[in-house]
Each structure stands twice: as structure tokens, then as C-alpha cells.
């Protein structure tokens, strides 16, 4: 009985560890890549399917994936998507190519982009420059954040030295964090769980909010990294931005259900199965056609959906739209004299959420972050159980605005005050360096474990990838159609100015900079609304068509139409008979500027300016044309490399080890290993299934090897080794999920039949999630869907006139169907049953085995000659195919 109890306990422990290893949140994996060298020397490759799991919320600079091939780093990088998928970024071939929203992305951030605007002067909330503080901060940057290859090497040495001592501390920290860091998932505590964060998260938020004080990248692109995500839009509970390690509770939908809504097909990107792309494009919500003008205002009308339950809200989410109201036009003096005129239009949810998101702390101008917003809720203090101070690897793509928590302790109080000013809503002042309560003391493992245990899920960082939105009252455009940066920064609007008078959006001089391009409020509002509601930017094609088709041609507030010299000459003439601008007392306090600070034409009211422009256009109508602002280069996602890019990788024939790694500040480095196989255009491939073909059964073949039990068919390793010795390449194709790549790859390396191992070959798995693959293979029993897509893609890498697949091994009729669809001759399709009986599809009555087929390897799989492209000059007429064809049926009546 003791033996039985010990065995049962061992099985339970092993299964528990196995379950932890296949947790969907940690399912990182990499599917092997096949590169085929063509006859002309060019290259073609299969898609790079790489997935990272449980990385939390990342900022754009931390979404860069480094690649190492055969132990050497290559000058090639990937980017991380919202669902953990990795992809390459390439420029579109056509300048105005229309891209689907799920393919649109931004370029990979590089180190140079973060050093462009270092010399930008800091501005106080009142608008005064502080050169002394700017110089102090630039000095800190020069001494603290600029890193060289030698410093990177030192960090690697320290990291290796620290790695051995940190393992024990990580286990203790994660165990202690589960007791102290409590994340609630009940419906009553949802709001409190999102609002009440520890002092660690508060410090991280403050650090993240202060980063735009130092740097504003000049290159912004109007396309985000968002794709069809299963995460549904919920009403935000807090007005402050989420930190880099913040979790959001999703009680309405479990992890299993949310994962089942994702579909990731071969060669594509993850998509939501709730609403397909076609349904999204064909679905027309109940909205009214809106003609934008200078007097167009935007107001959110609260609908009855707020009172619907969580379940009913999911069903009605598609029909919930924001109504845009166009009020009657009024004079500028009336608008600006009443600061609360626009505030009355804005409902409380809009004030606390939308406006704060428009002026998100990560994307405010320099002066807007001098003090924290007053609406930010004080965060509760949480004592950190871990005193661990790790040295993480710093990615070369993280710009100088990244600062490590250990470095914060060494900052002087004056410099630290620039990063972390006192919050207005916090009761009492907090002393700056608290050695034991700093946010970095808590290990990231504890946060991840708490999320996995409590049912929470780390949000994708589509919200963290919002653009840099800046407001200014500079007004107008120069003759070349662009606004100078100095003029824009001179009249920038701070948070306090906007908070005191939200009616600034009605000011005709308001200019909004998004993606380094300048808009007025009528055009910027839909873009900001899309970012807030859907966490996605409007596609470039939509913005361009909106500018071309919807923009009024006779409006003084649309600044995307080029002013000709004749227009600029007529404007001063028409201004001579006009009244002067209203006095400064009628304007809001935030819009008052020193004398001579603005051009004369910007002091006129909106009605006067529009009338003047309309008169000038009426006198001399000139056909206008859109003016492109900033860079017109767009970028799209890709899973394949071009021939030139593959040539730079310097692959050698056969397997090449590849490692994909991503480094974050708070979670260290996550690595994912795979193999790139370089084959020739005339190679012959043997396809082999895994579950039920190499193993004795489908289900037990995945479980028993993890328990140490050999569940492999006898003689298969020897057979495959003999076939490989004759010059054939092996391809292992299974419908398992990408998250089981490491487990499956380890099993193939583990198989050993009396010293004979399986030949190495690419492992082709389904890129979908674990539960989707399990549902397709076990419940639907249609694994051939994936196999046909995958094998057809591999087949297309070779010459069109060649058939790369020579033979195939499987265990089900589904496998036979898939192999037949990709062109494998049925005389070389073999299936095996759980008893180990091998059956040839052409002669099903003749049963054999792996051992017997090994004796006929030289005949069935003859040695491939290097001078020939196949085993025989005419393989279709060999003695194993042609002479074994059935005798054709002949109608005796026709012979008589």
C-alpha cells in the first residue's frame, strides 16, 4: 500500500507540475522555420511563428525582440503584438497603400529616436522656461542613462554573477507575495482592485508620467500595433494612467473563455472569433452622417446600456455608439467668456475618463506634467516582502528615458523632485527615498503568480502605445503649410490651463499635434475617440479619405489645405476694414499671452477669420490639394523575410539554432528557442505525424512521456534513421499548439531506441492557443485543417514543377486525407494503429511493421543520388508504384 501511495503521490505531483507548465499565460513557444534556397540562389522561408506569454503590460520601447542565430546576435529584430505574437515590420511598397487595420503597425523604435529631442527646453506649468533644471537633468542623463557596449558587457557580467544567488530569493519572494499582494476578483471589489494599488505601483506611475518631460520622439506614425483582440472595452475606473505592471480584473470572462475566442491560423495573425473581420466591415452601427465644420462639438450621450448587466452588455457592445451633436454656432466672445460652456456639455464620465485619456500622462507635452492631476486617487501602501535588488539586462532599444529603480536611490532630492513631484491628492508629504518600501523591491514573479492564482489577466499594451497628443494655441500655418516647432511649443497648453477652462477646444487658434502632424479639434476628436474607445488608431487610409472627402473646402479651421500666394495677399487687404480683436479681458486667463507673442492674424475671432477666408476664396477660387504633413511612410506587419534579409543571416545548410529574446525593466529577459533549417530546392521530404504515429496513442502519448514512461512505437527510430541516411529530410507535423513547442521538441530529442535517435527536422505546430488546438483535434476531430494549410505552404517554397514530399507517416484517415491533398502519392502513405501494425494505403490488406519496413528501406526509400533530383529517373514508373497499380477495369461489352 505504501508503494501505491507513493506512486499515486508522484503521479499527482508530476501532473500538477505539467499543468503549471502548460498554463496558457506562460505558453511561450516557437515553431521551426524552413528556408529553401532556390535554383537561382534566392531564398524563400516559412512564417516565423513566435509567441511570448505572461509578459504583462509593456511599453512600445520594450516590445522589441532580439534575435540570435547560432549564438551570434543578428541585425534583425521583431516586435511584440497585443496577443504575445512576434512579427517583423516592413515598409509598404506603395506610398498610399491601403492596409487592413490588423496589419498596420509602427516602426520598431531605435536608440536614435530617443536622442533627437534631448535639447527641448523644459517648460513650467505657467509657461516659464527652467534652463537650470534642464541642464541638471541633461547632466543626469549623460551620467546615468547613456550606455556603451562596454557598459552592456558589465551589466551582463553582473547579471551572470547575480543569477545564481537570485534563484532562492525569487522562490521566497513569490511565496511571500502571494500572502501580502491580494488581488480581488469578486464583482464587488472590481473598482477597488483597480484603484487601490500599492506604493510600488504609485511610484512606477509617477516615473512613467515623468518620462515625457525629458524626451519627445519626433517620429510618430499614425498606425498602432493593435489587432483583433478578445479584450472587450470596459468603462475605466480610474483617471490616472495604468502603470507598466498594473493588472486589470476581468470578472465577466474567464481566461479559458477569452482564450477560446482567439483564432490563429498558419501564416496569419491572431484574430477574434467573436466578431470576424468581415462582420466588422459589413456591420453598420446606427449612426448619423456628420459633416464636420468649425462649430462641430462632440458630446457623449449616455445610453441605457449603462444599466444593462454584464452579460447583456457583451451582447449589445456592437450596437453601442457615441452620438456626436452639432450645436448652434455662437460668437467667440460668448464661447470664451463662459469657461463652463463646454464643461456643461461634458458628462462626468467624459471628464474623468475621456479627457484624462486625451491628455494621458505618457503623451502630454513637457509642461503638462509639472504636477500630477488632481483627480488621481491616492494609492494604498503595500509593504514589499522582497528586498531583492536585481540587475536586469537593458535592451539596446530602450531609450534614455528608461531609469532603473536602483538608480533612483542615488538621485539628489532636487533631481528626484523632477521625476516624482508630490501629488496634490495625497494626504501629507512622503519622504523621497524609503529604502524598504520602494516599488522595485517587489519581485515581478510575485505579481505574475498573484495574477495567475486570482484569475486576473495582464492587459495588452495597446493602451500604453497611445500617441503623443499635444495641445497648443499657436494657430494658423506658415506659408509652406507647416507650423514651426518653436511656435508650437511657445503657446503650449498645460494641464492646469485646460482644467481651468476646457472651453479652449472652441478657440480657433487651437492646434493639436498627433503623430507629429497638426490637426484642428474637428479632425483630431475622432482620432482621440478611437484611441480611447477601441485602443486603436484610425487607419491611415481612413484619415486621408476623411481629409479629402469630408473636409469643408471653405473653412478657416481646416489647416490641411494649402494656401496659395494669392490668398495670403488678399487676406491683409480684407483685414483693413475689419474690427479689431476682442480685448484680452474677454479671453480666458489661460489664453492670455504677452504682447507680440502671437502673429496678428491669430488674434482675430473665429467668425471674423472664417469670413475673411471665405471672402478671399470667393474672390479668387483656387483648387486646393491636400498637403501631407510629416512622414508618409507606412509600415505593416509581416511574418516572412525577404531573400535579401535571409541572405544577411548567414545560415549554413541544415539546422541553425535561433533564440528570440525580449527584455523588460521589471520582468527581466524572456527567451524562446527554435531552429531554422536551410534546405535546397531539390530535397525530398518525409512527413511524419507525432501523436499516434511516433507515440502509441494520441492522448497518452502526450502525458506518459512527461511521467517518464516510454510510449513510443518499437522500431520507428531505427526506420527513420535509416531513411535519413539515404538523403531524405524529415518534417514533423502535429496539430499541437505552439505553446507545447518546447515540450514536443524535447520529446523528439528524448526518443532513443537502443542508441538510435530520431533524425532532426523542423517541427511544424499549430500557432493557435492550447485550448483552440485541443478543441480542433479532440472535439471537432479535424486536425487536417491545419496540416493542409501548413504543408501546402511548405510545398510552395519549392520549385513549382517539383514535388518535395516523397512519403508520409500518420495514424488516422484525417492524416491520409491531408497527405493526399498536398500531393503525396498514396503508394507511399503509411498509417500505423495502436498495435504497431503498419498499413500502406495502396495495399491496405497487407499489414507490416516498422521493423519489417526497415528491412526494405533500400528499396522503398532508395539512396538519393546527388546527380539526380529523385531516387529514379522516372519514379512514377518504379517497381513500387507502377507495377503495383491495380488492373484497370475493362467493359467486356465494348470488346465484343
UniProtKB/Swiss-Prot annotation:
SUPFAM superfamilies xref list: HAD-like
Function: Acts as a magnesium-dependent phosphatidate phosphatase enzyme which catalyzes the conversion of phosphatidic acid to diacylglycerol during triglyceride, phosphatidylcholine and phosphatidylethanolamine biosynthesis in the endoplasmic reticulum membrane. Plays important roles in controlling the metabolism of fatty acids at different levels. Also acts as a nuclear transcriptional coactivator for PPARGC1A to modulate lipid metabolism.
Residues where Phosphoserine is found: 106, 174, 186-187, 243, 303, 566
Short motif (Nuclear localization signal): ranges: 153-158
Residue ranges, compositional bias (Basic residues): 152-162, 387-396
Subcellular location: Nucleus; Cytoplasm, Cytosol; Endoplasmic reticulum membrane
EC number(s) on file: 3.1.3.4
Keyword Ion transport: no
Keywords of this entry: Congenital dyserythropoietic anemia, Cytoplasm, Disease variant, Endoplasmic reticulum, Fatty acid metabolism, Hereditary hemolytic anemia, Hydrolase, Lipid metabolism, Membrane, Nucleus, Phosphoprotein, Transcription, Transcription regulation
Family membership: Belongs to the lipin family.
Residue ranges with Polar residues bias: 426-448
GO cellular component, one term: nucleus
Annotated stretches, region: Disordered: 120-208, 370-405, 420-459, 569-636
Domain of life: Eukaryota
UniProt-recorded Gene Ontology molecular function terms: phosphatidate phosphatase activity; transcription coactivator activity
Catalysed reaction, written as an equation: a 1,2-diacyl-sn-glycero-3-phosphate + H2O = a 1,2-diacyl-sn-glycerol + phosphate
Motif interval(s): LXXIL motif: 700-704
Region (C-LIP): 635-837
Regulation: Inhibited by N-ethylmaleimide.
Positions of the UniProt region annotated as N-LIP: 1-108
Disease listed for this protein: Majeed syndrome: An autosomal recessive syndrome characterized by chronic recurrent multifocal osteomyelitis that is of early onset with a lifelong course, congenital dyserythropoietic anemia that presents as hypochromic, microcytic anemia during the first year of life and ranges from mild to transfusion-dependent, and transient inflammatory dermatosis, often manifesting as Sweet syndrome (neutrophilic skin infiltration).
Organism from which the protein derives: Homo sapiens (Human)
Designated name of the protein: Phosphatidate phosphatase LPIN2
Compositional bias segments (type: Basic and acidic residues): 569-579
